[in-house]
Amino acid sequence: MGAAPSRIVDNLLDDTNFDRAEIERLKKRFMKLDKDSSGSIDKTEFMSIPGVSANPLAKRIIEVFDEDNSGDVDFQEFITSLSIFSGRGETDAKLRFAFRIYDIDKDGYISNGELFIVLKIMVGTNLEDEQLQQIVDRTIMENDVDGDGKLSFEEFKKAAETTEVIQSLTLQHNI
């Protein structure tokens, strides 16, 4: 391992919840996923991760993992994002990641339209659009403390704390 990769691992030790052995193990998994050896995982490679392709929010998850908006997920982005979901991940970081799934335009708020889009992805054709819109409207109305018609992170966080969202954002598997 050269100086640059060693420095990356050292940075990841400081910035994540993983120890050196876990990072090395995840690096091997990352390299297996990186089928074209480009140093990053594209959408197709990301979808080959077990359980990801079946997740209706897979596209949004990839976009949130991709911090620099390059279209691919590099090793640092991969490890940093996975760290959030480890058992040692902080609740606030887990909720911020979930918030970013909904905040499609990255303006720091979840609008009525964004909430509708993400929930539509999740429920598919199981609900009529009118029913879904009623749920979205009620969700915004019940949680929009400042009355601006959208949810800030703090409003989202308060709403999520009353549900089992935090538990569902923790990986239960040994990495």
Swiss-Prot record:
Q: Which residues bind Ca(2+) 1?
A: D34, D36, S38, S40, E45
Per the record, the coiled-coil ranges are none
> Gene3D superfamilies, alphabetically?
EF-hand (1.10.238.10)
Query: Binding residues for Ca(2+) 3, per the UniProt record?
Result: D103, D105, D107, Y109, E114
Give the record's keywords alphabetically: Calcium, Metal-binding, Repeat
Q: Which GO terms describe its molecular function?
A: calcium ion binding
- Entries under InterPro entries matching the protein: EF-hand-dom_pair, EF_Hand_1_Ca_BS, EF_hand_dom
- Pfam families under this entry? EF-hand_7
Q: Where does Ca(2+) 4 bind?
A: D144, D146, D148, K150, E155
Q: For binding Ca(2+) 2, which residues are annotated in this chain's numbering?
A: D66, D68, S70, D72, E77
**SMART domains in alphabetical order:** EFh (SM00054)
Q: Which residues form the EF-hand domain?
A: 21-56, 58-88, 90-125, 131-166
Which SUPFAM superfamilies does this chain map to?
EF-hand
Q: Which family does it belong to?
A: Belongs to the calcineurin regulatory subunit family.
Quaternary structure and interacting proteins, as annotated: Composed of a catalytic subunit (A) and a regulatory subunit (B).
Q: What does this protein do?
A: Regulatory subunit of calcineurin, a calcium-dependent, calmodulin stimulated protein phosphatase. Confers calcium sensitivity.
Miscellaneous section:
This protein has four functional calcium-binding sites.
Q: What is this protein called?
A: Calcineurin subunit B
Q: Which organism is it from?
A: Kluyveromyces lactis (strain ATCC 8585 / CBS 2359 / DSM 70799 / NBRC 1267 / NRRL Y-1140 / WM37)
The gene behind this protein is CNB1
